[in-house]
Amino acid sequence: MLPLLKKLYLTFARSSRIIITLVIIDQLSKWWFIDNLRWKPDLMLKFTSFLNMVYTWNYGISFGLMREYYQYSNAIFLITNTIIVCYLYYLMIRSKTIGSFAGYSFVIGGAVGNLIDRFFRGAVFDFIHFHYQNYSFPVFNLADCFITIGVIILIEDYYSTKKVIEEKAKGNYDNAQIEAMAEKIRNTDKGGNDKIASLQN
């Protein structure tokens, strides 16, 4: 029981630093752009020819989906996202690699950042807008970036771990083959020596 509690405490202590840092960065960025963009003409701040900061409230899910069902979707996604965050935290506690631990921490940090928006503001604030000529990428925020980074880390960690396991299994298989061949040679040599000994007798 004590080792389990110690593991839970250490996991909480390590992950909290990452998650809280990401949430603070996300919320500070939203606070700054909410405070500054609302007074800009067209609610927009142009950074480059392909990047704008825009004042946008997302009442749906990612990329503005289901915004027409806002009065139902906000409560539903508050509940479902909270459940998902709790499940991800459970997976993080069980993670066995640094990569998976970091990946889950980033995903949880981003998810909590957007959950705070939904709970206190009733919608998620998005402000980063990439566009090129006639193409316009859906507006997003730093929390979405953290979630994406976390997913990429988890995918990379999965395939790296899988490769290590396969190489280890292959190494064990090769060692078993070598041992079997050595045993066969020893048996063959023993049989040959017995025949020689019988001839000598």
From Swiss-Prot:
HAMAP family: LspA (MF_00161). It holds the Pfam family Peptidase_A8. The active site is at 126, 144. Pathway: Protein modification; lipoprotein biosynthesis (signal peptide cleavage). Belongs to the peptidase A8 family. It is a multi-pass membrane protein. Keywords: Aspartyl protease, Cell inner membrane, Cell membrane, Hydrolase, Membrane, Protease, Transmembrane, Transmembrane helix. InterPro entries: Peptidase_A8 (IPR001872). It comes from the Bacteria. It catalyses: Release of signal peptides from bacterial membrane prolipoproteins. Hydrolyzes -Xaa-Yaa-Zaa-|-(S,diacylglyceryl)Cys-, in which Xaa is hydrophobic (preferably Leu), and Yaa (Ala or Ser) and Zaa (Gly or Ala) have small, neutral side chains. It comes from Rickettsia africae (strain ESF-5). Its EC number is 3.4.23.36. This protein specifically catalyzes the removal of signal peptides from prolipoproteins. Signal peptide: none annotated. GO terms for biological process: proteolysis. This is Lipoprotein signal peptidase. One of its GO terms (cellular component) is plasma membrane. The chain crosses the membrane at residues 73-93, 97-117, 135-155. It is found in: Cell inner membrane. GO terms for molecular function: aspartic-type endopeptidase activity.
